[in-house]
């Protein structure tokens, strides 16, 4: 899963990568950290992204550098990605914005840099297989603006696309907020445009500079591509909210016209800024508590109380869970309201009017199978008017949660939360109303914020996490001989 990375332009020497194991603790305290292996590189600064492939290799994208390591963080290969020259010959550092894999042809995809373009790279030697001498603008070229991208199917076209969400930018003509990019063929990284429509969603020209959208995370689920976003509550508002937006992977015409949005709420309205997200199928106990459908997954999101203009997170955080079946119903309601609404005032509420070409026809019969994915001419860009409230299970009064990853251990659902002070919180998600934070792990050699990318190894016995200049692999064993420590199973929500 991809996410928002607000990177710094400050250059600091050396990236340190460390393999660590961490002993089980019985309470929230400093961890006993055992260093197993280290990797250092003096040619780089400021890490941006990490991803693991199906074979266990780990890829790390830093400023002007890209690495491939094995599962033990042993160095395998690296390549230089920057700096890049502008038209005047001035050099600009290359900050990576997107790092993802197209498994159909075993290619690593990287995006970023001064031109905001993408490269298709060999998974093994990291060399660019396909690039362009005339860059295709895909993502923002500003280090402080967000971009999220991931590879997911497009069933009508018959091959995957690179789904991208990026903050409004000035580098290049008309970069769409949300787009589906070709990753095969002659028009690589171009938007799909043909007689049926296009795979792009643009903000209305009137709001290009006044309606910024921050992209936090993205994922694929049940033939839709989703993005977690932060945006203004209304076009003329100074208040910000978090929204989930999606496009359909099945549309056979008018491709992305079925783009729609739903507002996310957690705890109360003050927790308005989504910081990180993770989608997974929880373990048995939590699945039963949530009454999940077969194979249904849950979206975990970390929120922060924010201050506005610009939207800035504070150290008050909350974790909310969303059943994907409820999310899907909320999007269905948005489309249905857009199609069958009665009267101009209702029609206006269901229209995502900040998007170029948005319209709700109204007064038409709604058929989910026909309209939810294929907009045809009945609507373009629906806005849900009913907020989607999550299960509020944990909160922190003095901790900014910056990243989240969730896994299952036996019948338990366990989360790992990165913080703004460089620690990791271990959380037991017990049921639909509560969770227990039962351990705090100190991130060795750094108090810098944990960045969003947290991934598990192939066996899910370790997880990888990093700050902007330290990369580590943790063992997350919290039990002894298959049994949880007493504090883990005895603590109860009160």
Regions of interest found by a model, annotated:
Residues 45-49, 401-404, 448-455:
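Canonical WD40 repeat/beta-propeller blade segments in eukaryotic WD-repeat proteins
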Residues 209-214, 218-220, 226-227:
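Surface-exposed extracellular loop regions of Gram-negative outer-membrane beta-barrel proteins
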Residues 75-107, 112-210, 230-398, 410-494:
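Beta-propeller fold recognition
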Residues 47-52, 59, 98-101, 217-218, ...:
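Short, exposed beta-strand/loop patches in secreted or surface proteins that constitute
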């Amino acid at each position: 899963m991809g996410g928002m990375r607000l990177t710094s332009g400050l250059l600091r020497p050396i990236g340190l990568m460390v393999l660590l194991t961490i002993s089980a603790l019985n309470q929230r305290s400093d961890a006993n950290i055992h260093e197993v292996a280290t990797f250092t590189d003096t040619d780089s600064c400021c890490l941006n992204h990490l991803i693991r492939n199906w074979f266990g290799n780990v890829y790390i994208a830093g400023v002007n550098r890209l690495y491939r390591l094995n599962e033990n963080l042993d160095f395998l290969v690296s390549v230089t990605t920057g700096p890049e020259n502008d038209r005047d010959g001035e050099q600009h550092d290359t900050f990576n914005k997107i790092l993802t894999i197209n498994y159909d042809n075993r290619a690593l995809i990287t995006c970023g840099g001064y031109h905001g373009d993408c490269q298709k790279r060999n998974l093994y030697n990291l060399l660019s297989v396909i690039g362009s001498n005339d860059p295709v603008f895909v993502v923002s070229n500003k280090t402080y603006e967000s971009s999220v991208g991931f590879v997911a199917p497009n069933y009508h076209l018959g091959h995957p696309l690179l789904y991208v969400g990026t903050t409004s930018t000035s580098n290049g003509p008309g970069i769409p907020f949300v787009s589906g990019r070709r990753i095969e063929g002659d028009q690589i990284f171009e938007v799909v445009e043909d007689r049926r429509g296009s795979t792009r969603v643009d903000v209305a020209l009137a709001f290009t500079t006044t309606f910024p959208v921050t992209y936090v995370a993205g994922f694929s689920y049940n033939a839709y591509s989703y993005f977690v976003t932060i945006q203004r509550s209304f076009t003329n508002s100074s208040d910000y909210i978090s929204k989930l937006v999606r496009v359909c992977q099945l549309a056979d015409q008018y491709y992305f016209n079925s783009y729609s949005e739903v507002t996310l709420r957690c705890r109360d309205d003050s927790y308005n800024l989504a910081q990180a997200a993770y989608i997974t199928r929880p373990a048995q106990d939590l699945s039963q508590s949530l009454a999940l459908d077969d194979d249904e997954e849950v979206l975990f999101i970390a929120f922060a109380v924010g201050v506005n203009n610009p939207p800035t997170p504070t150290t008050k955080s909350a974790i909310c869970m969303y059943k994907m079946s409820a999310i899907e119903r909320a999007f269905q309601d948005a489309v249905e309201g857009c199609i069958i609404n009665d009267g101009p005032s209702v029609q206006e509420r269901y229209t995502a009017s900040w998007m170029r070409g948005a319209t709700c026809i109204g007064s038409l019969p709604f058929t989910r199978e026909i309209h939810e994915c294929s907009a045809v001419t009945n609507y373009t860009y629906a806005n849900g008017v009913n907020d989607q409230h999550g299960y509020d299970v944990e909160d922190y009064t003095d901790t900014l949660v910056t990243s989240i990853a969730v896994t299952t251990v036996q019948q338990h659902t366990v989360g790992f939360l990165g913080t703004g002070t460089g620690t990791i919180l271990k959380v037991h998600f017990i049921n639909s109303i509560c969770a227990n934070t039962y351990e705090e792990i100190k991130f060795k050699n750094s108090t810098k914020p944990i960045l969003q990318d947290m991934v598990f190894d192939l066996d899910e016995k370790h997880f990888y996490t990093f700050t902007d200049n330290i990369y580590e692999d943790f063992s997350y064993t919290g039990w002894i001989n298959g049994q949880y420590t007493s504090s883990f199973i005895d603590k109860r929500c009160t």
